[in-house]
Amino acid sequence: MVVGPRGSIKIGRDKSNEMMVNSTKASRVHARIFERGGNFVIADQSSNGTYVATDGNSREVSLRREETVLGERGYIGLGAPTEGHGDHVLRYRLEARKP
């Protein structure tokens, strides 16, 4: 999935999302990823929270209607922690692309 400058993607169960997931733990519109100031940010918009585990950092961030800057790569848990890597967990990697 590509998110460019001033772009964003919505993640959730609903078909209107750019990234649709099939997990009962995820909300219809669960989270949004967007670019701000050269960083990629994830904003939780769910009922059950979003969890972010960045590779190289043992501490998982729990979001409840909050946002955080994404690290270079890691895991996103939709509605539950990333431990166990079930159908609610997304693996992500950020990379710069030339226009």
Regions found by a protein language model. Name each.
Residues 3-5, 35-36, 44, 71:
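Generic beta-strand structural signal
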Residues 6-37, 83, 89:
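Short, charged beta-strand/loop "edge" motif centered at a coil->beta-strand transition
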Residues 38-39, 75:
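Generic structural signal for coil-to-beta-strand starts
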Residues 46, 52-99:
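C-terminal boundary/linker segments immediately following FHA domains
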